């Protein structure tokens, strides 16, 4: 359950609180994974009526089912299948949003083995339909998070079909850093609003 501050508009903000608001927050220090931080961010967006974005369920291959009762089935063996698309999708201000989230402890690059061909194909299809598609890349050791447009990911992937790692320099050059916070933890919609809907990114 995510707790949100009550009546944020009515609260008086002091200079110190303003500084704290803009201070980067490391969600890992609070025992939260990158995925959990994104889920909490999406819950915040939903609660505030900002956007409706959800994590897609991981597909499961059912292998064995027992029927202890005629009217009740029990799955006793199943396996997670490889996801065929991306992690998250939804809608923001009438725009379709679709993205993947990846995390690494490496300091200089993001392993491309984390991305699969069918995911790249899915992202290309989303872009063809004018959807907003991207990846959120978190470098845990550096405590840095980046929004990388899907086109930049696809362009790099096509160089070697995902056999190498994507240098951090490439990500910094072609993406945008997401400043982590408290509410929401991973404010990626700020990038979309400023760089895409605002018309800065071409």
UniProtKB/Swiss-Prot annotation:
What cellular-component terms does GO give this entry? cytoplasm
Gene Ontology MF: a single term: endonuclease activity
Catalytic reaction(s) noted: Endonucleolytic cleavage at a junction such as a reciprocal single-stranded crossover between two homologous DNA duplexes (Holliday junction)
Kindly report the protein's main subcellular placement as a broad class: cytoplasm
For this UniProt record, give its keywords in alphabetical order, as a comma-separated list.
Cytoplasm, DNA damage, DNA recombination, DNA repair, Endonuclease, Hydrolase, Magnesium, Metal-binding, Nuclease
State the protein's purpose: Endonuclease that resolves Holliday junction intermediates in genetic recombination. Cleaves mobile four-strand junctions by introducing symmetrical nicks in paired strands. Promotes annealing of linear ssDNA with homologous dsDNA. Required for DNA repair, homologous recombination and chromosome segregation.
The cross-references to SUPFAM superfamilies, in alphabetical order and at most eight, read: Restriction endonuclease-like
| Annotated TM spans | none
Site, as annotated: Transition state stabilizer = 102
Task: Name a biological process GO annotation.
Answer: chromosome segregation
Gene giving rise to this polypeptide: recU
Q: Report whether Magnesium shows up as a keyword of the record.
A: yes
User: Which compartments is it annotated to reside in?
Assistant: Cytoplasm
Give cofactor(s), names only. Answer: Mg(2+)
Q: What is this protein called?
A: Holliday junction resolvase RecU
Enzyme class label = hydrolase
Q: Which HAMAP family match?
A: RecU
Annotated positions binding Mg(2+)? 85, 87, 100, 119
Enzyme Commission number: 3.1.21.10
Q: How is the cofactor bound?
A: Binds 1 Mg(2+) ion per subunit.
Show the Pfam families listed in the entry. Answer: RecU (PF03838)
The family classification in the record reads: Belongs to the RecU family.
């Amino acid at each position: 359950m995510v707790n949100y501050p009550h009546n944020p508009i009515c609260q008086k903000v002091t200079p110190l609180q303003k500084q704290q608001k803009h201070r980067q927050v490391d969600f890992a220090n609070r025992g939260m994974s990158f995925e959990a931080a994104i889920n909490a961010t999406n819950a915040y967006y939903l609660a505030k009526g900002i956007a409706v974005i959800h994590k897609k369920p991981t597909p499961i291959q059912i292998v064995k089912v027992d029927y202890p009762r005629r009217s009740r089935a029990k799955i006793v063996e199943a396996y997670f299948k490889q996801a065929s698309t991306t992690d998250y999708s939804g809608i923001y201000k009438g725009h379709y949003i679709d993205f993947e989230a990846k995390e690494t402890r490496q300091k200089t690059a993001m392993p491309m083995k984390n991305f699969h061909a069918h995911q790249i194909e899915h992202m290309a299809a989303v872009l063809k339909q004018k959807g907003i598609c991207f990846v959120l890349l978190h470098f845990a050791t550096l405590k840095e998070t980046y929004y990388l447009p899907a086109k930049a990911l696809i362009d790099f992937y096509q160089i070697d079909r995902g056999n190498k790692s994507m240098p951090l320099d490439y990500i910094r050059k072609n993406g945008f850093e997401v400043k982590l916070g408290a509410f929401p933890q991973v404010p990626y919609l700020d990038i979309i609003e400023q760089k895409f809907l605002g018309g800065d990114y071409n």
